[in-house]
């Protein structure tokens, strides 16, 4: 991926390529010179999707390269004073992708899906020191609504989210508690969740009503300050203990009676992250990488996975 920024820092742009079994191209830019902030992204490559083709439908469709466009605009109001960082961010987002969507009402396919999303976020937390992993004290609240105004097959998704930060038992330790609630109105299709299921579960599980509570305790382990030539600089090792709880509800049709019933699920997971903050080849952007181990009591499974993130700001 290529990144660029103008001298004032008001305009940033990116362009990249990836291989996902097919050629995929990505590009975007963000302009912060005037309010509201404007953000544009486009992804191109692969065949566009055909959503829910009936078995008895033999209609020939001309598939094109998949194109997804996201346009976002927001105003980052800031009321920061002294030690407290305070802000309020209203946002609107428009997305389009050129999939085929089947409608049982018209018994035909509709080309292209348009999605509108609106959100507001408010936050207030203490400024962090260099060694802090999370704010020592603070709160974040957010509410969002998403719908498909030109695709009658979908309903809407609405969610509310809150997160609180509290100090840990030692310096630079942090306790983070969060809770979220989501409701989806279903018409012809059930859409994917906007929230993440507990760690260790897949986000493509069906859901109509979902509530989630999470607890994370983050702590620094050591500061090796070690480098191997110009290739790797290891700055810090950290750990994170977590526990996730969720209640999920959705409707389903019984195979025998064909009656519609509600299914209630209780989901739980817990685990640990071991992470390292590193710089590779003297690149300025820090890389956070490590291992996550999740235990799911429902299935008694232990699931290891790799974590990787890059901070570009």
Regions found by a protein language model. Name each.
Residues 1, 5-9, 14-27, 32, ...:
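Solvent-exposed loop/turn segments connecting transmembrane beta-strands
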Residues 60-76, 87, 214-218:
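Gram-negative (and chloroplast) outer-membrane scaffold detector with strong preference
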Residues 6, 17-21, 33-35, 42-48, ...:
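Transmembrane beta-strands of outer-membrane beta-barrel pores
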Residues 8-13, 25, 34-40, 77-85, ...:
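Repeated loop/turn-to-beta-strand initiation elements of outer-membrane beta-barrel proteins
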Residues 40-47, 53-55, 59, 106-243, ...:
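C-terminal outer-membrane beta-barrel translocator/porin domains of Gram-negative envelope proteins
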Residues 12-14, 28, 37-41, 87-93, ...:
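Residue-level detector of the transmembrane beta-barrel scaffold of outer-membrane proteins
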Residues 120, 215, 271-274, 302-313:
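Outer-membrane beta-barrel "beta-signal"
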Residues 1-30, 35, 39, 105, ...:
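Outer-membrane beta-barrel initiation region
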